[in-house]
């Protein structure tokens, strides 16, 4: 998922491949403390809040797996304490040395879009899910359905930069 959102790709296969673990036993995240702190190929630093939210929507709206949201340290982007030269080679890194243990981190976890996906997941507990793209790899659709219009729902993450017309889009939702 992290690699997909780094390259601005919401292809459904990135959100449904659970190799070596069954979906009901998977733990999903966009980034973790380890990828963030260890500076794997600069991926954490390159992820904007917008793309973290797209990834979060894709992993959290589904039926199976537990989703974890990493709360980045406050004002990330500083050095690792290596004499001013961070692991990234330019003096920047994920820690500013302004944060102390127990300090609040980023407020992104409180974002209304993050909260909406969390509410969607909670409202759809136990319902089947289907993950697909809505026309291209910049529009991800997660359907949750029980066969009743009153119980069915859909989450759409649209990274196209403009409104997406979903008319005629095939779904598993009840009419």
Predicted feature locations:
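Active-site-proximal helices and loops of the catalytic beta/alpha 8
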Residues: 1-175
